[in-house]
């Protein structure tokens, strides 16, 4: 804790004052009679003697009379400022506060609409802020009067951020569950169908890059082979069997 320098310094000497008895015995405070103090309270223009002791013996300049013909005499303040009696005698006017009565406007008729209120409400309303992630990506708007077949779907253009997130998900898992697909669609503001199609196309590309056989083609060939085997086997058994008896 920091201490003051005069407490640390041992050479500091306390100031010594004379005792109280010396003040009463000596002439430090001049003794006055009780009438002296009562006269000070009664006389408002009393000034202390020290003010006059400060002045050297120069004479005060004579003051000219401020009283004109037909005017009352002016009052000189103790500091030498001239105060006219008219300013002292006339009271200051009190500020008057006039409150105008506020009459409420009559309500509009039943057939009329308050246009001013509508304009104020319209001006107070602001356009809602729509962020990019709140918008749906490439949603085709079909007119209600369209009576043709199903409109052609446009190709979805994924953003760089969406592609990056989908690539990271594909790196860890090439097949998504329904629950995970819903989570990704909600995070990237896409539909489940768009996520499903993107993963299908990405798996096809991955198989093509790694030169893997297509599972759809292989399954089709296996089904044709399994369906054609019974006919071939029956023909072979008939050819290899004994000749018919006469």
From Swiss-Prot:
DNA-binding region spans which residues?
151-210
Q: Name one GO biological process term.
A: anterior/posterior pattern specification
Q: Which PROSITE patterns match?
A: ANTENNAPEDIA, HOMEOBOX_1, HOMEOBOX_2
Under the heading InterPro entries, the entry gives: Antp_homeobox_Deformed_sf, HD, HD_metazoa, Homeobox_antennapedia, Homeobox_Antennapedia_CS, Homeobox_CS, Homeodomain-like_sf
Chain span(s) of sequence motif Antp-type hexapeptide: 130-135
Annotated Polar residues bias:
39-48, 112-123, 216-239
One Pfam family name is: Homeodomain
Q: Which GO terms describe its cellular component?
A: nucleoplasm
Q: What is its main location?
A: nucleus
What Gene Ontology terms describe what this protein does at the molecular function level? DNA-binding transcription factor activity, RNA polymerase II-specific; RNA polymerase II cis-regulatory region sequence-specific DNA binding
State the residue spans of region: Disordered: 23-125, 210-246
Name the keywords, alphabetized.
Developmental protein, DNA-binding, Homeobox, Nucleus, Transcription, Transcription regulation
Record-stated family: Belongs to the Antp homeobox family. Deformed subfamily.
Q: Sum up the protein's function in the record's words.
A: Sequence-specific transcription factor which is part of a developmental regulatory system that provides cells with specific positional identities on the anterior-posterior axis.
Q: What is this protein called?
A: Homeobox protein Hox-B4a
Classification lineage: Eukaryota, Metazoa, Chordata, Craniata, Vertebrata
């Amino acid at each position: 804790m920091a201490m003051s320098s005069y407490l640390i310094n041992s050479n500091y000497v306390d100031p010594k004052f004379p005792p109280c008895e010396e003040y009463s015995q000596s002439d430090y405070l001049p003794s006055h009679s009780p009438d002296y103090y009562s006269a000070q309270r009664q006389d408002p223009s009393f000034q202390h003697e020290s003010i006059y002791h400060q002045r050297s013996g120069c004479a005060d300049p004579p003051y000219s009379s401020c009283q004109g013909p037909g005017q009352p005499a002016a009052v000189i303040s103790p500091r030498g400022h001239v105060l006219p009696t008219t300013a002292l005698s006339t009271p200051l006017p009190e500020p008057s506060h006039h409150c105008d009565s506020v009459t409420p406007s009559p309500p509009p008729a039943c057939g009329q609409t308050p246009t001013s209120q509508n304009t104020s409400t319209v001006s107070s309303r602001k356009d809602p802020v729509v962020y990019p992630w709140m918008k749906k990506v490439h949603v085709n708007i079909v007119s209600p009067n369209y009576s043709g077949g199903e409109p052609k779907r446009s190709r979805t253009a994924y953003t760089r951020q969406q592609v990056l997130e989908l690539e990271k998900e594909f790196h860890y898992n090439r097949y998504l569950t329904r629950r995970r697909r819903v989570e990704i669609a909600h995070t990237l503001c896409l539909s489940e169908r768009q996520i499903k199609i993107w993963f299908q196309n990405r798996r096809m590309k991955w198989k093509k890059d790694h030169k893997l056989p297509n599972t759809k083609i292989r399954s089709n060939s296996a089904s044709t082979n399994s369906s054609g085997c019974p006919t071939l086997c029956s023909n072979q058994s008939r050819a290899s069997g004994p000749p018919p008896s006469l």
